[in-house]
A protein has these predicted regions:
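C-terminal output helix
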Residues: 94, 112-121
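Alpha4 helix (beta4-alpha4-beta5 surface) of REC/receiver domains from two-component response regulators
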Residues: 23, 68, 91-106
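Receiver (REC) domain active-site loop signature in two-component systems and cognate sites
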Residues: 61
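Active-site residues of response regulator receiver
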Residues: 58, 88
Length: 129
């Protein structure tokens, strides 16, 4: 499925370089409606206030990590079905199991490239239609 330019995506990572790389990758795909947050707490506020189609969030962040954000999103009635891709620098099984139990739609191990991100997004968004 082609990704629509009108997709509204929230990128959550405490590292500006990762947010910038992810933004550039999304822009190469033609996606222009991109929000950013530095931590889970900030992201939760954005997700509640802004209509979104997808959250792409890092796991390790201060204040509220990606798993905490995922649980908060799944626990909030208005946004609980929002598609969620978790980014991690670790591909450990325990994290993957915890994320799956919390309701993650997909995960991606950093570093990643354009093709892998696109594939994960298409899988997640295609499953939502």
């Amino acid at each position: 499925m082609p990704l629509a330019a009108s997709l509204k995506v929230l990128i959550v990572d405490d590292q500006m370089s990762v947010r910038q790389f992810t933004r550039m990758t999304l822009e190469k795909m033609g996606i222009r409606l991109i929000h950013e947050a530095e931590n889970g707490q900030e992201a939760l506020g954005t997700a509640i206030a802004q209509p979104l189609d997808l959250i792409i969030s890092d796991f390790n962040m201060p204040e509220m990590d990606g798993l905490g954000l995922l649980r908060a999103v799944r626990g909030h009635q208005a946004i609980r079905k929002l598609p969620f891709i978790l980014l991690t620098g670790r591909g450990d099984r325990e994290l993957v199991v915890k994320a799956a139990q919390a309701g993650v739609n997909n995960y991606l191990v950093k570093p990643f490239n354009d093709a892998i991100l696109r594939q994960k997004m298409e899988q997640v968004l295609g499953a939502m239609t």
